[in-house]
Structures are given as structure tokens and as C-alpha cells.
Amino acid sequence: MGSITEEQERGLIDAVEVGAGLAGWHGGMADSFRESINYQFMVGGQWVAHPGNIIEYEVNVVDHEDPVTAGLEDFRMRSEQYYMHVDPSNKVLATTTFSGEHVPWIEGNVIPVVWKRKWGKGRVFYSSLGHVAKDFEVPGARTLVERGMLWASK
């Protein structure tokens, strides 16, 4: 979506490595700098597609013990369901399963929706939810981002 200079990239990555938190959602974080592999490694993933554009889908909370997800149950969204390339070292907190209705070869694929990770001494939180502000009227989506940002800031 955008570009980042080597100097800017190094500054951001260095800041997180020494303890700064980084949190974000949707394409603003996972499709910011397609040409920056180092940024993608730090974030833990890269957007690929949203088959069907705005559709109904389910978000499945997979870790009910984590402070970011404690007390949350699965919930429905009507938004872009992100298909992503994701780092297997992420601590996945929520996933979604693709129906295959819009792209048959991804039927049954489970893709992380929300994750967190350490990057050096820093913390990184990401949620693919949040294409438009209205998406955060869904309590589960809003709570995940609120708690995730707080976790990353510690």
C-alpha cells in the first residue's frame, strides 16, 4: 500500500527490538509495506486477498486463557475476511475458516485473524478485523483491539 525507506524501516524495527510496542489492524498494518520483508517478519504476516470482499464469517477465539482473549466467545463479522501469509511463530489468539464459496481451493483453510508476538524486547499485536469503523461496533472485535493495544504497550 505504501513505501518505507530503509532508514525508516530500520528506525521502526530497532524501536520495537529495544522495547517499543507496535499494535494495529487490517491493511493499515498487514499491507503497509509490501516490499519490506523485514517489516513483514516483525508484524508476523502479510495480507494476500479478501475473497468475496464484504461477507459474513465467523471469528473463532482459540486461546481463552490469554489476557487479550479472556472471557471472549466466537463471534460473527460482516466485513472483509482476510486471507494472509502468516508466520508460524505467532501466538495465534483467533482464527477464521474459509468456506470456499468465493475461491474453491481455499475451502476449509483456517487462517489466523488475531495474533501477538515478541520482537526482541518489544511486543507486536495484530488483528485483521476493522475494514471500517463500524466493524468495531461488534463487541468482540472492539475488545480484541483494545486489549491487544494495551498488551503491546506494556
Model-derived regions, located:
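Stable alpha-helical elements in mature extracytoplasmic
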Residues: 8-11, 35, 64, 141-145
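Short amphipathic alpha-helical segments and helix-helix/interface helices
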Residues: 9-13, 83, 149
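Extracellular ligand-binding/catalytic regions of CAZymes and related secreted enzymes
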Residues: 100-111, 118-154
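Catalytic beta-strand/loop cores that center a nucleophilic Ser/Cys/Thr
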Residues: 45-120
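Active-site-proximal beta-strand/loop segments in catalytic clefts of secreted hydrolases
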Residues: 1, 25-29, 95-98, 127-131
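Glycine-rich, charge-decorated loop segments at or immediately adjacent to ligand/cofactor-binding or catalytic sites
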Residues: 30-42
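Short alpha-beta junction capping motif
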Residues: 1-33, 121
